[in-house]
């Protein structure tokens, strides 16, 4: 479009430039492009811990951590009921906490808006799982779909359910794990989800399809009581757990390439029944049991580099274990 105005254009007139698709205003005999900026109103990249077991009972609390500053918010809001062992998943805007025990197993699926801090109950009813069960991990997601695997009813099951995160409604059968399992861990890239059962098996699903999980490779050690996994869009990790004695190892694998996990470093402490949350460059591992006692300590790793974890010098309240871990910046987005 011409930068010269037609005759009679008033000062302050506004137009859409059809060549640049930008808004312009007229001043001093010329058209000028508006300076525009879209502020980030979602609070930045944050991880969340929902529900879980705490000393003396269970909690419905939602707590958050800012990945950049490592500052925690221990009163972000609440899921709809106090329960241990929910599974977590998320898109960029919506967090999901599914199932758990009150102590009886529930089929409840809650959702909440991660950009909005609430006082009191902040989660809403999304729908129901195909059966009531407790996970202690077992969730993963892309931007559009969340998948939940295994758990106890109280018997161990191999069920895989999925939901479409942006909608509401009941979960739908996706397929089955290769065997029944409780305390299944999960982590995802945008296209592929990896589950690790309480043995050395790594199994994968293609998130956008349905069907049974398939063999991916093996961990170096048993994945019992490891909580959920973490990582970026290229690399997933599992760490800690209690194969026979609590462990510290970071075990890493590349989503696009099937094969065995390799050691990538260590956590600061032996930890099991913990929860994790991810951003592209910083992943937090928090809570759970450390040396047999409940812990509220948080450590972090960089998923792009090997090495030991770093203490955040921050903490979550009430030392949660078996909680849902999720974020608005994980590797599946």
Identify the role of each PLM range.
Residues 1-333:
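Polar, enzyme-active/binding microenvironments
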């Amino acid at each position: 479009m011409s930068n010269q105005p037609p005759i009679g254009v008033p000062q302050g007139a506004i137009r859409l430039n059809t060549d640049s698709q930008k808004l312009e205003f007229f001043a001093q005999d010329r058209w000028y492009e508006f300076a525009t900026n879209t502020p980030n109103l979602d609070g930045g990249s944050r991880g969340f811990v929902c529900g879980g077991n705490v000393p003396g009972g269970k909690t419905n609390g939602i707590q958050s951590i800012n990945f950049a500053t490592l500052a925690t918010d221990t009163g972000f809001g609440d899921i709809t009921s106090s329960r241990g062992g929910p599974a977590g998943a998320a898109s960029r805007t919506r967090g999901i906490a599914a199932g758990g025990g009150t102590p009886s197993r529930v089929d409840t699926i809650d959702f909440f808006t991660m950009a909005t801090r609430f006082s009191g109950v902040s989660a809403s009813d999304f729908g129901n799982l195909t059966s009531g069960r407790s996970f202690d991990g077992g969730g993963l997601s892309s931007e559009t779909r969340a998948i939940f695997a295994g758990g106890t009813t109280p018997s161990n099951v191999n069920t895989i359910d999925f939901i479409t995160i942006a909608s509401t409604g009941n979960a739908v059968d996706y397929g089955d794990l290769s065997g029944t399992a409780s305390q299944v861990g999960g982590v995802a890239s945008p296209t592929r989800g990896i589950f690790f059962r309480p043995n050395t098996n790594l199994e994968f699903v293609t998130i956008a399809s349905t069907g049974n999980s398939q063999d991916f490779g093996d961990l170096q050690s048993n994945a019992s009581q490891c909580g959920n996994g973490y990582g970026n869009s290229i690399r997933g990790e599992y760490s800690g757990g209690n194969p026979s004695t609590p462990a510290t190892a970071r075990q890493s694998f590349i989503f696009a390439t099937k094969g065995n996990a390799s050691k990538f470093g260590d956590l600061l402490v032996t930890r099991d029944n913990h929860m994790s949350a991810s951003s592209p460059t910083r992943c937090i591992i928090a809570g759970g049991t450390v040396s047999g006692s409940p812990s509220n300590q948080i450590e972090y790793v960089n998923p792009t580099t090997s090495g030991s974890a770093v203490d955040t010098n921050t903490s979550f309240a009430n030392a949660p274990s078996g909680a849902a871990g999720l974020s608005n910046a994980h590797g599946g987005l």
